[in-house]
């Protein structure tokens, strides 16, 4: 059965940090003050929750249930053969009105061993808006020891934890891959489109000033002594940093990949300037950033799209193109690339 692209309703919900007004404005959602994230085209739940985080279709059905009922129409045979009914991707909008806490995410091996999950949480940020002189924390600035970090966590030494990070300047159009295990933080006011593995796995190194009990909920139920084994203690070298960061400035007049090739095993994202260039058939999530256009498919007709629309595009809709407007398309990895990802 050939399915059609679907414009998704907003999927904002409460979180432990402040923000969300820009998401509400872009996506016609509820906005802030404590809804700093929207999960777009999500078949992933919040950690420990049954349905929170799941996207709904306009008819009220969970996207996850629609996929489970007909995975091949949504994904195509190659994806289903490699990944089953997993979307292999989670797409979010992040709009923090306060600095995110220093935190990190486990990799696949740790998640498999300790949580019986098939995915860790390598993620990447596409900077949509940022204040002048905005920065993100990306890895420790020098090699740390587990007991030293654990002591900072026990003492709730937020200043020391933040000072321990390498701070990287960012601007709109930058894209940063954040490998699992990397300690990181995002400053207030940076509006981000995030792609990640389809889990909600975060370990907190600090939580003062946030609406979360880190002693209870900051370690994935494993205890800090265990969860700290998922943390990368050595710094990201200058050479490695170049492999993680790409800057396009959103200026291309042609379709352009936004990430470095290091991201290929986890997810893909392309800027679509509305020039009508073809995107190959496959499960896709499209966020319209500017203007109005027509999304044309080979199998399922056309649909009008506009600023702030978010769509899920099934494989069975066929090849497609965006004619007018500007958007970012987010896609899961190709199976061959995913097989090589650590």
Outline where the language-model segments fall.
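Loop-centered beta-sheet repeat module
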Residues: 155-204
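His/acidic/aromatic-lined binding-pocket segments of jelly-roll/cupin-type domains
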Residues: 91, 100, 117, 123-126, ...
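Short acidic-glycine-tyrosine-enriched beta hairpin
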Residues: 165-177, 294-317
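Ligand-binding loop in jelly-roll beta-barrel domains
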Residues: 94-99, 107, 130-133, 182-201, ...
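Transition-metal
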Residues: 1-145, 208-247, 269, 335-336
